[in-house]
């Protein structure tokens, strides 16, 4: 075995799903799941995470550099990226850091239907119903990276559960993973999130004066002792993700048709993705 092959083998053995980072939150391999046709989603190339602002220790950065990430797709708004920049990524010029330019206020307004105009929180149930519409630009960025084999890739937002969870689910569904397993993967975020790590050392009370995302975070308890992430389901126990996938089925019939219609993928693109990211 060559030195490079040995290093890759050791790296692969260093984690099962969650990367052992000192200051990571919900940072995990999004692959390595079986598909309904007997294949398996590739491991070691598709990663997902919550905010990576707190990743700055030498040990964390040295570990992550071993993966030789080619792309980071940041799903966050302008305000989120301004408040909590991906510092280690921005310092690594070998990584293609891509994002869509939009305001957190757009996200909040897209979830406000049926809510009070003065409500400063995101209506989670409403937001999941429109994710397949509001996240189209970000989904295009992610799938472009996959089609151009700009991997390993990290897909992330602030908590690594809602926007990231939805787009990861769309990919897994396209690759042939069962919905039951997709929901299991989605629900992992409740236990794998580390809210205190995500919050970092930021003075949210001060930042809220000029940053809408900081103000939003205060409404969720930022600046107070952090709690575990909340379960990602309705009061009836239904995963919020099901609302988003059902919306795709209602509007398009299938994830594949959705990706062709809204994201612009061709049948050849889809075949290429399945061949490249499953085995």
Positions of predicted regions on the chain:
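Cys-dependent protein tyrosine phosphatase-like superfamily
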Residues: 1-154, 167-279
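Ser/Thr-glycine-rich phosphate-binding loops at phosphate-binding pockets of nucleotides
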Residues: 159-164
